[in-house]
Amino acid sequence: MKIACISLGCPKNQVDLDVMVHILLSAGHETVADLAEADVILVNTCGFIESAKTEAIENILEACSYKQQNPELKVIVTGCLAERYRSQIEEEIPEVDAVVGCASNKAIDTIVARLFHGEDHLESYGAKKDFPLGGKRVIGTPAHYAYLKIAEGCNNRCHYCAIPGIRGPLRSRDMADCVAEARWLAGEGVKELIVVAQDPTAYGEDWGKPGSICELLDKLNRVPGLEWIRIMYAYPERITDEFIAAMKRNEKVVPYLDLPIQHCNDTILKNMNRRSNRAELLEVIGKLRREIPGITLRTTLIAGFPGETEEQFEDLCNFVKEVKFDRLGCFAYSAEENTVAAKMDGQIDQETKDKRAELVMQIQTGIMAQKQAEKVGQTVHVLCDGIDEESGLYLCRTTGDAPEVDGNVCVSSEEPLYPGQFYDVLVDDSDLYDLYGTVAK
């Protein structure tokens, strides 16, 4: 069978899809890029917040529309939306042939076979403790970078977050298994390894070994062939002296962290069930910048959390001005069913939430413009991702730019640059998100 895949959501979801694609290929199926050619369309969904759910539903409906020209087409929905809304998907979109929960990913080949043996409207779910950790996979990203998922689930229980209800509690992946996959990825040509989980800094806590991320970084740093190791998502309360020391002693670990602080006001943080306060956040950020000069810090903020007053929002704005994060995203609070925050008093209207998020981003725009302009005249070390055919510029990234999240260094060069190769680039211009330059002589 010809299988087409639509991948939505976070890098962790991409890894799940990579495992499913490997299973399908091993069963004798083939993948195609064109949905119109497919016998099966697999929609791997995100269901984290309202905008992600909307995007997922739009893609499911698009996949189902191909049944008009191919009535035998099968549409399978997997991922977080499938896990979260089991019966609703089949009830509201009856054109869907199978809804597969995350714990059943490894049965995807059996589900495809059952569909083509005449069964329909299949549902397959397992216990959250059975969500697969690791497994043989394809590399669904460009060949020179890949995501390594080191854990599943989360124990943080933030009051706004639906993930523990979807993905279950923290289950850390065996360290030897993580290192073995990293070695395989490096052998396949991966130069940049991006370590992901809901909270990588919690790795090993379910074994009773907090701080195990430090040992894992030591081992990953010794994998031949890897050049950059990037840690995505680091919770402030787990940025210990030991963690900072591990970043410093392992030269392949790039000076980059995404700290999802969500807010800075002590009352709001407490209501979110976050474990840091404003003073502790400032201390951690200051220590990171002192100990790792040049580190790029990204964060995510929520505006309009239930009960957020004008004064508390102003506190957030002042914090953004004071800290000057290198990268920042601010989102209007999304009330997710079956979360504590959705039942709180003081829900804020959508217009106000959107306006507050926009104001934070306006502040960050000024900060970004200044930081970008300061890089003009510098020489930066970059990894080439490929070429933009329209502009003819090569798209590269510094250690401060995560793929698909941050900006690019757009390089003009008479000589060809190659994906997966490193270059030194002289920056001669900038805009809000990207730098521009030429290969340094």
Q: What is each model feature region?
A:
Residues 1-203, 242, 257, 279-290, ...:
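Proteins enriched for Cys/Gly/acidic motifs involved in redox and nucleic-acid/cofactor modification
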Residues 97, 191, 227, 326, ...:
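Short acidic/polar active-site loop segments enriched in Thr and Asp
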Residues 93-94, 116-118, 211-213, 247-248, ...:
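Short, hinge-like loop/turn segments at secondary-structure boundaries
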Residues 75-79, 84, 89, 187-311, ...:
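Conserved SAM/AdoMet-binding glycine-rich loop
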Residues 10, 203-225, 272, 335-366:
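Radical SAM enzyme [4Fe-4S]-AdoMet core and its adjacent flexible, acidic
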Residues 343-441:
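Terminal RNA-binding accessory module
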Residues 178, 195, 231, 259, ...:
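Conserved, mostly hydrophobic/aromatic
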Residues 197, 233, 261-263, 299-303, ...:
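Active-site proximal loops enriched in glycine and acidic residues that flank catalytic Cys/His/Asp
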